Amino acid sequence: MGIQGLLPQLKSIMAPIGVEALKGQTVAVDTYSWLHKGALSCGDRLCKGLPTTRHIEYCMHRVNMLRHHGVKPILVFDGGHLPMKGDQETKRERSRKENLERAKEHESAGNSRAAFECYQKAVDITPRIAFELIQVLKQEKVDYIVAPYEADAQMTFLSVNKLVDAVITEDSDLIPFGCSRIIFKMDKFGQGVEFHITRLQRCRELDLNGFTMQMLLEMCILSGCDYLPSLPGMGVKRAHALIQKLKGHEKVIKHLRYSAVSVPPQYEENFRKAIWAFQFQRVYDPVTEDIVHLSGIPHGSSEDLDFLGPWLPQTVAKGIAQGNIDPITKEPFEGKTESSALAFDKVHLNRESSAPSNGKKKLDLPVQRNVLTNYFCLASLEAKRKFRAPKVTPKQQVLNGSLPSPRIEDSGTPDLIEDTSLPSNNIQVYQCSSEHFSSGTPLDDSINTASQCSSERVRCDIPRDDSASVSPQCSHDIGSDPAEDPDIEGNKVKVNFCNRSTIPTGSFLEGTLPGISDPFLDSHNTEPSRAAPRYAEKSNVVSANRNITVRSSYFKTVNKRVCTNQGEDECHDEDNCETGNYTLPGDQQRSSGGILKRRKFSDPQNFEDGMFQPTSPHESPPVADKGCDSDSHDGINTNSEGKFGCNVAHVNKYSGIAEKSMDKFAALISSFRYAGSRASGLRAPLKDVKNTLPVRSVLRPPEQRFGCTAKKTTRVPLQSRFSSDATNSTDVPDLSTFAYRPTTASAHSDQGKITSKATDAAAGPPDLRTFAYAPTRSTTSRFDQSENTRKAMCTADSPPDISTFEYKPMKSAVRRSDGSKFSGAALKAARRTSRS
C-alpha cells in the first residue's frame, strides 16, 4: 500500500529516467509488484487454480528488457507475514474474499466483464506462484532472493550496503525505509521516474529544509502506513506541518490529545513499534547467509523483538532465500511445476522448440489433405470417364487437314508440356488450372467430356455431313489427369460449364508443339498439318476459307440464364454456375449449299430452309419459353457467304415487341392529358367546372384592379381643428367622438359652437388628428387665431401633422385680472407651434 499521498507531494523532485541510464549497474526489483500487474491479465485463472503463465511471461519480459540494456537485475520476493502487519493482512484477505464472491455471482449471472474485474481484485500472489517464477529464473540464470519477511526492507538492506545501485518498485514505503535511489513507474519500454534522497531539500510541494531522516520517517508514519493507520483527518500535509513545528512524534501526539483529537490509548506504543519496524526489521544477508537486522539495534534494549519478525534458524533462512522453502509454512516446495516448465519454454531465448500453453500439438497436414487442395485437385466422376476414338472417313480427313496441334499459353509466356504419348483410341480432357488446351478430334458416335475448371471456355466447331460424322475443334483448360472410366454412354456429349470466359481463338490455332502428339493425326491423317489462320475477333467459325459455319449445341433445360450466340457463346448470368446435358443426334440433315440448320429445343424436327425473312414488328410470332430465353430462335440459319454474327434478322422480332409495348404505354399515358393531373397517372384528374380553358393562364391579374385609392371628401370651410372634416358619411361611426377632451368652463360663449361642430363631424370618416390631445382655449382669443385654424383645416387631405400630438399646457378658463401679460405670451407660443 505504501504511504498514501506521498509521491504526489514529491513530484517536483522526480526526474524521468530511461533504462539506458542504468547500463552496467545492478538493480533490485520488487517482484511482487510485477506479479500483481501480470496477474491482471489472468486473474480469473489464478483464482480458479487453472494453469497459466501470463504473469510469468510479464515478469520475464521486463527481466529480458533489463538484461538487453546491460542492466543486472536482482529479483526480490516477499517472505512471511510480519506481525506488525497482521491487521493490514487481515483486511486485505477479507477484501479478496469479498471480491471473489462477487466475481462468482457476476459469472453465474452472465456478466463476464464485471466478474473479470472482481477476479483481478481477488488475486492473491502466494509463495507457490512466486515459486513458479523462481524456477524460470533459475533456468535463465537470473539472480533472485526471497526476503524472510518484507521485500521493502530487504531491498533497502541491499541498497544501503551498496549491493545494488537502484531499486525498481511501485511502493512508496522505500522512502521512509531510507533507500537512497528509487525508480518508480517503470513501463515495459524501460521508462520511469527516479527519486533520489539528496533532492529532498529542493521539494516545492513540501518544505523539507531542516528535516532529518528521523523526522521524515515520523511524518510518513503519522500520515498513515502499513504498520500503523493514520488518525482521522491526518494526511501528509498536516503531518508535515506538525512535525515541522514540534520536531518529534511525542510532542505531536501530546498536542493532538490536548487539541480534542481522538487518539487511541495504544497509539503512541504502536507508533514506536512502527519506527522500529522501519529501522530494525529482520532481513537476509547474502554475504553471511543469515538473518540480520536492517540496522544495528541500540544497546540496552531488552524487550521482545518478535514484532520485527520471528527469529529463524540459518538453514531455514537460507532455504527461504533460495526459494526452496515456503516462507509461510516453513516447508519445502514440491518438485518442478508444469506451469514453470511451460513458461521457461516460452521465455527461453535459445530454445529449439516451443510447446503451446494448451498442450496441443501443431496440426501438420500434407498438401493434398487440406480443404483447399481437395476442392481444386479432386476430379469428378464425369472427368474420370475415358473416351473412345470415333471412326473417321476420308472426307473428314480432308476437312480436318488444317487442324492445329495443341499449344500452351500462360499469361503470354508459353510453357512446353512434357512429352506425353496419348493413345489413339482415347482422348482425356483434363481438369483446368491455368492452361488452355485445343485439340481437333473426329467423332463417330459420341464424345464424353467433362471440365472441372472454375473459369473455362468450351468452343466446338463441328462440320457435319450426311453420314453423321462429326469433327469438332474444342478449346479446353488443362489441369490434372483424371482417371479413366470404362463406362461409355453413346450419342451424348456432356459438358460442365462453370463461369465460362471467352478465350481468343487465334492464339491457340498457330503452330504445333513437339511435346504432344495429336491422336487423330498420328492414327488417321496422312496429310501434313497446316497452320490455321489467325482470327482478330472472337468467333465460332473454325476455318474462314470454307463455306461452313457450325455452332455448338445448347442445353436442353437451362434455367435462369440468358444466352446469346452473336459471335460468341457467352452467358450473361455468369454468377450462377449450372451443369446441363445436351444431345448431338447422329442424324442431322444438311441442306444443299453448305447451310447447316440449327436445332430447336421444343421441336427437334422443325427446321426452316433459307435465310430468316424479317417480319413486321406487329406480326412477330410468340416466343415459346422452354427453359432458355434468347437461345432458341426458330429458323435462324446461316449460309456460305456470311457468318452467323452478321445475321441480325431476329432483331426485328424483338423490335416489334418493343414497339408494341411502347404503343401501349403511349396510349395509356395519353389519357392523362389534363393540366394538374399527376405525372404518375395513378388516377384521373379532377374536373374543374369553373375553369373551362384548355390551358390555364399563368398571367398575373392587373394590380390596378386591386389598387387602393384615397377617397376625397367635401371640405367644410373654416372648421375648427377640434372637429372632423367629413360630414357626408352616415354609415361609418365617428371614432373622434370617443376622444378624450378636457371640459372647459361653462362661462364661455363659444362652447356651443365647438359641440355643434363635433356633432356634424359624425357623418364623415374619422380623422386621426382628432385623437390628438389639445388643450382648450379661452373664448377671449385674439383675432389671428382663425388664421391658424384655417391653415390647419386646409391640410385635411394631407397626412396628419405629428406636431399636433405634442403636449401643450392648458390655459385657465377663468382669466385673472393680473394675468393678461402671461396669456399673451402663451398665445404667441401656441401660434409658433401651429405654424411649424
From Swiss-Prot:
EC number: 3.1.-.-
Co-factor remark: Binds 2 magnesium ions per subunit. They probably participate in the reaction catalyzed by the enzyme. May bind an additional third magnesium ion after substrate binding.
Principal localisation: nucleus
UniProt subcellular location: Nucleus
Function: Putative 5'->3' double-stranded DNA exonuclease which may also contain a cryptic 3'->5' double-stranded DNA exonuclease activity. May be involved in DNA mismatch repair (MMR).
SMART domains: HhH2, XPGI, XPGN
Positions of region (I-domain): 138-230
GO BP annotations listed: DNA repair
Positions bound to Mg(2+) 1: D30, D78, E150, D152
Protein name: Exonuclease 1
Residue numbers spanned by region N-domain: 1-99
Nucleus found in the keyword field: yes
Gene (UniProt): EXO1
Compositionally biased spans, kind Acidic residues: 568-577
GO cellular component: nucleus
